[in-house]
Amino acid sequence: MPALLKRLLFQVGPHPNERTFTLSSVSTDGHYISLRPFVKPSGDELSFPFEWAFAGTNETVKVNDQGNGVVTQDFNFWLDTNVYLNVPNTHRGEVNTTWKNWDSGCVEETGAVYPFGADKESVSFRELWQPVDPSREDLVIVSPNNEKFSSNARSIVLKVTDEAYDGLVIVIGRWIQGFLSQKNNNTIEGLNFIRLLEKDSGKSEFLLSYGKEVNKIPQSYENLKKGSTVTSNGLNWEVIEYHA
């Protein structure tokens, strides 16, 4: 089933915090994107107001159900902004994570990264996620008792890979997140992100728009089917998943 999760907490070391409005979208077929813009960016953050962003297809993650509400997910991100921008002390390669369902409906994610090299000391992290109902305009939490939306929420994924660009758009219910990156750029000038919300009126509202080429990211998702092509300002996107 598709999922939309809002992060409630991020912790490295003894002090938890949350400075972002992070949403992670996971499609029915397992494609994913996580956009993590700062709520109150300051200083150098103003030019690139993101803690992090990453995305990938289901070919870039290995998911294993361990039972008793525990799942492991091992990621090899297609897009990792830290890697794309060559940020110093950035983990490279697979990221191993463990996800545990809480009775409340929240999901705890734990794992470790190796920013100084695979043979160096690891850095452990912890994140807490709240599933929300993607079929609602407001951020309505999902508890173990109100998950009926899941069978009705649409799940649409568009992808672009050509000589100049990589890109992925994931539509989960009313909520849309996407990225477009220029190949061989590796600066913030090559990154573009959108987060859209389809309102009750039928119109879409930009909650996030970053980059000089966001107009190349599709912003309408009607009359599609798997395998079809959408052209947005000269860039062709393939529909790789369609459940509506």
UniProtKB/Swiss-Prot annotation:
One Pfam assignment: HRI1
Record-given protein name: Protein HRI1
Residues with the Phosphoserine modification: 143
Family classification: Belongs to the HRI1 family.
A Gene Ontology term for the protein's cellular component: cytoplasm
Keywords: Cytoplasm, Nucleus, Phosphoprotein
Location in or out of the cell: Cytoplasm; Nucleus
Record text on subunit structure and interactions: Interacts with HRR25. May interact with SEC72.
Main location: cytoplasm
